[in-house]
Structures are given as C-alpha cells and as structure tokens.
Amino acid sequence: MTKFSLLDHESVPKHEIISEGELKSVLSKYLIEKEQLPKIKVQDPVSKEIGAVVGDVVRITRKSQTAGEADYYRLVIE
C-alpha cells in the first residue's frame, strides 16, 4: 500500500522550512521579530510531513490571482 502525501494534493500549497539566513532577511524586510510571525502548530499534518520542529519557520507559497504566487511565513509552535 502506498502512503498518501498531503503535499501532493492540489489544495495544499507548497510548504518548506527556511534557513536562518532567509529568516533574517524576512524579519528585516518586515521589521518584525520571529515571535510576531503568524503561528502553525507542530502537530499540523503538513508540519509533521515536512519534519518541522518547534522554532522552525515555514514558508508557504500560495497561488495568488493578483501576484501569481505569494509567500506566507509561519512560526512552528507547540
């Protein structure tokens, strides 16, 4: 039996854990602290699938009618 991957479903946008360097760039771009980012739980099915741990920041790339694609960032919490 093959395992179903959430990330392969058309309704689930691309999720990926970003590097510390990219995180610094994002935080300086928006003039915010890491703790001010929107949150995603470590128990979220996609968080589990990508191997995210508490403290990671996840970039979610969604389709946008106006921009083509838009990036959203979430801090992984307990």
Curated annotation (Swiss-Prot):
EC number: 2.7.7.6
UniProt keyword terms in alphabetical order: Cytoplasm, DNA-directed RNA polymerase, Nucleotidyltransferase, Transcription, Transferase
Location within or outside the cell: Cytoplasm
GO terms under biological process: DNA-templated transcription
Pfam families, alphabetized: RNA_pol_Rpb5_C (PF01191)
Annotated GO MF terms: DNA binding; DNA-directed RNA polymerase activity
Primary location class: cytoplasm
Keyword Transcription: yes
Entries under InterPro entries matching the protein: Arch_Rpo5/euc_Rpb5 (IPR014381), RNA_pol_subH/Rpb5_C (IPR000783), RNA_pol_subH/Rpb5_CS (IPR020608), RPB5-like_sf (IPR035913)
One of the record's GO cellular component terms: cytoplasm
Keyword Repeat: no
Swiss-Prot/TrEMBL catalytic activity: RNA(n) + a ribonucleoside 5'-triphosphate = RNA(n+1) + diphosphate
Top-level lineage group: Archaea
Function: DNA-dependent RNA polymerase (RNAP) catalyzes the transcription of DNA into RNA using the four ribonucleoside triphosphates as substrates.
Family: Belongs to the archaeal Rpo5/eukaryotic RPB5 RNA polymerase subunit family.
Subunit structure: Part of the RNA polymerase complex.
Name listed for the protein in its UniProt record: DNA-directed RNA polymerase subunit Rpo5
Organism (species): Methanosarcina acetivorans (strain ATCC 35395 / DSM 2834 / JCM 12185 / C2A)
Lineage: Archaea, Methanobacteriati, Methanobacteriota, Stenosarchaea group, Methanomicrobia
Protein's gene: rpo5
